[in-house]
Amino acid sequence: MNIEDLKKRQEKIRNFSIIAHIDHGKSTLADRILEKTETVSSREMQAQLLDSMDLERERGITIKLNAIELNYTAKDGETYIFHLIDTPGHVDFTYEVSRSLAACEGAILVVDAAQGIEAQTLANVYLALDNDLEILPVINKIDLPAADPERVRAEVEDVIGLDASEAVLASAKAGIGIEEILEQIVEKVPAPTGEVDAPLQALIFDSVYDAYRGVILQVRIVNGMVKPGDKIQMMSNGKTFDVTEVGIFTPKAVGRDFLATGDVGYIAASIKTVADTRVGDTITLANNPAIEPLHGYKQMNPMVFAGLYPIESNKYNDLREALEKLQLNDASLQFEPETSQALGFGFRCGFLGLLHMDVIQERLEREFNIDLIMTAPSVVYHVNTTDGEMLEVSNPSEFPDPTRVDSIEEPYVKAQIMVPQEFVGAVMELAQRKRGDFVTMDYIDDNRVNVIYQIPLAEIVFDFFDKLKSSTRGYASFDYEISEYRRSQLVKMDILLNGDKVDALSFIVHKEFAYERGKLIVDKLKKIIPRQQFEVPIQAAIGQKIVARSDIKALRKNVLAKCYGGDVSRKRKLLEKQKAGKKRMKAIGSVEVPQEAFLSVLSMDDDDKK
């Protein structure tokens, strides 16, 4: 193809993604678009086709972004090339959304006709506006009995400020309005800008590891073109590779002769080392490099940290390899090696949120067959010491001695909770219980309220989302962003078994709740840890001060069983002998801590706590 033909082809390309709150029908709409454009034969079609991970299909959520090429013949008789990039809707996967939006010129905003705008819808719309995307509102599920499209249309205009007069009324399930959506994409989404004859600049927005072909990069070509045989260079580290194959996904990978400006596809270049490629990096040609890299993504900082340890210690290296492969496919995961006296060798991992942590743990166990112990999640605290230093601590066992601590600051988040009016009281009560500070409250319409609180992140990573859903019967939607660090009265609580600290059970707690929390954990551990031959005291301590204690009684043999009658001194002698043996055992004995003990620190219910 000559340059002119490529430029004409570029004018026919439309890159768009679908953004929505969880469960507003995003993946179903993607299915209908695939059917309508006959990208997938009816034999291969299955519900939520783009959610290819078993975990995604089971939980009914999208975790990974997916990029697919479709051909659509519009009413004007021209054939257009669509690149559909499906994105997740959950707050923990916002990073995936921001990556896919950077590869697009337009976004379809799906809003549920019954539920209206939710917190996550807003968050994703603002991401799309930051990327200067053309936004096409679609009001979905209009066939539901509770649907009220006109109210939702007014909401889109009032709350988001988009012109919704031409919003498509659709039902992805029933296949209504799909053609109208496709026509709007042709008319309203701009063709990609960029020069075919400029030096190559391609943005890596995802990558996956293939055992045979090495790392496969998913890219959006911004300028120039790339074909098999080219020598490409990574702009962040200067590493070069020979391209073996380029192509597109239809969801299956299909090889092509070239990828040109505006295309979204994959590049395979026999890249064997996972660390050589980074999502957000720019690829260029080694013999004709671009002058500067593309504006990448802002690096996401993990919010929640937890220790991951293999149950079988010989699986440590397998766990490292598994984490490296997952990191390639999930750029927001971070990890570093750490050791624990109680659990041996493992990794300290950083996640974007609790669902992200859950999904990573499940993927490690499923895809790589590694059984794991996970320690209680914690956040990054700023510890100011008495000698003027500021330490960033994410692991409770690394906290300095209490005598060295001057003050501790913890991260607060701005939590936006959208909730029906009748549940406002329940939400406010929950937020206060989680040490939240009320900021403001707005009415979206007659029935729905947007409540904003400042809440410590440590309270949110625990079980806030579950509690919010149960106290509002599932009607509340929730989105949060980190706002600031604030000084708080925090203390580190250690758990001692038989006088020895168990580092993996340490946690940070607010001074106010320290006693209840300590008592609760001590009582829980008493039920879980098996009885030993000697008495085991379980203590919760802040520094040197013990705040709660519970004892596991010793198992004992009845040494008096064979004494019938006889002198009392004979019995006493046997009892003293037994006591001395127990004492010796206690001095040298160690207590095995079962896996459930670590999990019990995690599953601290508020109902137990209060």
Swiss-Prot record:
InterPro entries listed in its UniProt record: EF-4, EFG_III/V, EFG_V-like, EFTu-like_2, G_TR_CS, LepA_C_sf, LepA_CTD, LepA_IV
Q: How does it sit in the membrane?
A: Peripheral membrane protein
Locations listed in the record: Cell membrane
Enzyme Commission number? 3.6.5.n1
A molecular function annotated in GO for this UniProt entry is:
GTPase activity
Q: Which reactions fall under this protein's catalytic activity?
A: GTP + H2O = GDP + phosphate + H(+)
Top EC class, one word: hydrolase
Annotated Gene Ontology cellular component terms: plasma membrane
Q: Which GO terms describe its biological process?
A: positive regulation of translation
Residues the record lists as binding GTP: 23-28, 140-143
Q: Which residues form the tr-type G domain?
A: 11-193
Highest rank taxon of the organism: Bacteria
- Which keywords does this Swiss-Prot/TrEMBL entry list? Cell membrane, GTP-binding, Hydrolase, Membrane, Nucleotide-binding, Protein biosynthesis
- Family stated for the protein in its record: Belongs to the TRAFAC class translation factor GTPase superfamily. Classic translation factor GTPase family. LepA subfamily.
What function does the entry list?
A: Required for accurate and efficient protein synthesis under certain stress conditions. May act as a fidelity factor of the translation reaction, by catalyzing a one-codon backward translocation of tRNAs on improperly translocated ribosomes. Back-translocation proceeds from a post-translocation (POST) complex to a pre-translocation (PRE) complex, thus giving elongation factor G a second chance to translocate the tRNAs correctly. Binds to ribosomes in a GTP-dependent manner.
Q: What is this protein called?
A: Elongation factor 4
Instruction: Record the organism.
Output: Streptococcus agalactiae serotype V (strain ATCC BAA-611 / 2603 V/R)
